[in-house]
Design a protein with these regions (language model features):
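Thiamine diphosphate
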Residues: 5, 12, 164-366
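Flexible loop/turn segments at secondary-structure boundaries
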Residues: 26-29, 61-62, 89-93, 159, ...
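Hydrophobic alpha-helical membrane-spanning segments
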Residues: 153-161
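Short linear sequence motifs
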Residues: 94, 103, 112, 161, ...
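Alpha-helical protein-protein interaction elements
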Residues: 18-20, 80-82, 93, 102, ...
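Glycine-rich ThDP/TPP pyrophosphate-binding loop and its adjacent helix/strand module
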Residues: 1-147, 151-154, 332-367
C-alpha cells in the first residue's frame, strides 16, 4: 500500500526521512497479531534497503538515543531510517470505545510502565532533579494545557461568512491581466504574423521549460518523464536540459507521486507531477483530495500547496476500459482544487503556466 510505496521512493532517492511507527498494539480494536503477519512492523524496512530499529517506546532514554542515531543517519546523506516504538494506547479509540477487546490486567501491566512517572523517578534517583523540581515541571505543563483548553472552550464558533474564506489561496491576477489575456487570445485565434503554430504537446513542453527557467523551485516528477520524454512526448528534451534532480522519473506509484507533490509544495517548491492517465488519479485520491486540497482550509489560510497534477483524459484514442475514462467531473467535487481541461495548444500553454504559478493544487487534464 501507500506505506510501501513511500518507503520505496524514499530509499530510491535517498531522502533524509526518519519514519516513526508508534506501535500501540491495536488498530481500532483489532490487535496487531490479527492484522499483521510479523511481530514487528519495522522489519518491512529491510525490503527497501532501509535500516531500522525496534525500540521500547516506554523508555525515554532509549527513544532519545534511537532518534539521535536515525537523524544522524538521515543527515549524512545515507537515506531514510525506520523506527518502531512499541508503546500502548491508554484509552479507547474514541469516547464511545468500551475497550472490551482487552483485559484490565493488560492495561494495568502497561500502566506500570508509564514513562512519565518512571522517568521522573529515575531523574530523582540519579540526582539529576529533585522531587520539588519535578512537581514544578508537572504543574507548569498542566498550566499550559489548562490555558489551551480554556482558550478552545471559550472561543466562539467562526461565523458563517468565513465558511469559504480559506478554501483557495487568493489569485495574483488583476483586471488588467485578464483584459490583456483576452486581447491576446483574439489575436492568436485570428492567426497572422508573429503567431507561432505548435502542437499540443509542444505547447505543454514549452510551458514547463519556460517556468523551470523562470523559477528554480519548479520541478517535474512522474512516470516515464525522463529520458523517455513522457508517454505523449510533453517532457521531451527537458531531462537533458535540466537533469535528473529537476526531472524525476518515479515508480508506477500514483499515491506516492501525489503525496510527494503535496509535501514538496508545502515546503515551498512547485512540483509538476505527471500521472499517465486520469483513470489512475483515484489511486492518489487521499493524498490530493484529503491532504492537498484541504490543507490551506484546515490550517486557517496559513499554508499553501502550489502543485500541478498533469494527466491525460478525454476522447481521441480508445485505450480500453482502464485508460479512457473522463473523470474530470469527479475532481470538481473537491473544494480547494482547481480542475483545468484545455482544448487548444494556446490554452494548454497559458493555463499550464498559470497553474504552475498558482498557489493552489491544480488537476490539469490534457488530451
Amino acid at each position: 500500500g501507500n506505506f510501501h510505496e513511500a518507503l520505496n521512493l524514499a530509499s530510491l532517492w535517498k531522502l533524509p526521512v526518519v519514519y516513526i511507527i508508534e506501535n500501540n498494539l491495536y488498530g481500532m480494536s483489532v490487535p496487531l497479531s490479527c492484522s499483521t503477519c510479523t511481530p514487528a512492523i519495522a522489519t518491512r524496512g529491510a525490503a527497501y534497503n532501509i535500516p531500522f530499529d525496534i525500540v521500547d517506546g516506554m523508555d525515554v532514554l532509549a527513544v532519545r538515543a534511537a532518534v539521535a542515531k536515525a537523524i544522524e543517519h538521515a543527515r549524512s546523506g545515507a537515506g531514510p531510517y525506520l523506527l518502531e516504538f512499541q508503546t500502548y494506547r491508554w484509552y479507547g479509540h474514541s469516547r464511545s470505545d468500551p475497550r472490551a477487546y482487552r483485559t484490565k490486567e493488560e492495561e494495568a501491566d502497561w500502566k506500570a510502565r508509564d514513562p512519565i512517572p518512571n522517568f521522573a523517578a529515575l531523574l530523582v534517583a540519579e540526582g539529576v532533579a529533585t522531587e520539588e523540581e519535578i512537581d514544578a515541571i508537572e504543574a507548569k505543563v498542566k498550566g499550559e494545557i489548562q490555558v489551551a483548553t480554556d482558550f478552545a472552550l471559550s472561543s466562539s464558533l467562526p461565523p458563517a461568512e468565513e465558511l469559504e474564506l480559506y478554501v483557495y489561496a487568493p489569485s495574483s491576477w488583476t483586471d488588467a491581466d485578464v483584459a490583456r489575456e483576452k486581447a491576446l487570445r483574439e489575436r492568436v485565434r485570428n492567426g497572422g504574423p508573429g503567431v507561432k503554430k505548435a502542437r499540443y504537446w509542444e505547447a505543454l513542453r514549452d510551458a514547463m521549460r519556460e517556468e523551470m527557467l523562470r523559477d528554480p523551485q519548479v520541478f517535474l516528477m512522474g512516470e516515464d518523464i525522463g529520458l523517455y520524454g513522457g508517454a505523449y512526448g510533453a517532457t521531451r528534451g527537458l531531462f537533458e536540459e535540466f537533469g535528473k534532480e529537476r526531472v524525476r522519473d518515479t515508480p508506477i506509484s500514483e499515491a506516492t507521486i501525489g503525496g510527494s507533490a503535496v509535501g514538496a509544495a508545502m515546503c515551498g517548491m512547485r512540483p509538476v507531477a505527471e500521472i499517465m492517465y486520469v483513470d489512475f488519479t483515484p489511486l492518489a485520491m487521499d493524498q490530493v483530495a484529503n491532504q492537498g486540497a484541504k490543507n490551506r482550509y484546515m490550517f486557517g489560510g496559513k499554508t499553501k500547496v502550489p502543485m500541478v497534477i498533469r494527466t491525460e483524459g478525454g476522447a481521441g484514442r480508445g485505450i480500453a476500459a482502464h485508460h479512457s475514462q473522463s473523470l474530470e467531473a469527479l475532481w470538481t467535487h473537491f473544494p480547494g482544487i482547481y480542475v483545468v481541461m484545455p482544448s487548444t495548444p494556446y490554452d494548454a500553454k497559458g493555463l499550464l503556466k498559470a497553474a504552475i504559478r498558482d498557489d493552489n493544487p491544480v488537476m490539469f487534464i490534457e488530451h
